[in-house]
Amino acid sequence: MFGKGGLGNLMKQAQQMQDRMQKMQEEIAQLEVTGESGAGLVKITINGAHNCRRVEIDPSLMEDDKDMLEDLIAAAFNDAVRRAEELQKEKMASVTAGMALPPGFKMPF
């Protein structure tokens, strides 16, 4: 089934890929992305681990409706999460290149 040293090579490749994935996950956790809403009036910056790092609210919104401001904050956060997930997918593509993964399979992180 496995050629001479085939199983050993397979295990070695799996370990190398696991090491690369762990390193990439650590790098991704340090990256920051900013989501926006209200044409940039609300900005939320999160890191790759989806921890909120900064919230910026244009002063003109402080006089507006509280409900609208809450909606803009939620939309900016959701935009930041979407951007972080896209960035993670791009970064992990280099690690998983050549692997036959089923469609929609999400790598663990």
From Swiss-Prot:
Q: Keyword check for RNA-binding, yes or no.
A: no
Note the superkingdom of the native organism. Bacteria
Q: How does it assemble?
A: Homodimer.
Quote the protein name from its UniProt record.
Nucleoid-associated protein PM0205
Q: Which NCBIfam families match?
A: DNA_YbaB_EbfC
Which Pfam family, any one, appears in the UniProt record? YbaB_DNA_bd
- Kindly indicate whether the keyword Membrane belongs to this entry: no
Compartment(s) of residence: Cytoplasm, Nucleoid
Task: Kindly state which keywords UniProt assigns to this record, in alphabetical order.
Answer: Cytoplasm, DNA-binding
Function of the molecule: Binds to DNA and alters its conformation. May be involved in regulation of gene expression, nucleoid organization and DNA protection.
Return the HAMAP family for the record. Answer: DNA_YbaB_EbfC (MF_00274)
Per the record, the similarity remark reads: Belongs to the YbaB/EbfC family.
Molecular-function annotations in GO: DNA binding
Q: Name one GO cellular component term.
A: cytosol
What is the species listed in this Swiss-Prot or TrEMBL entry?
Pasteurella multocida (strain Pm70)
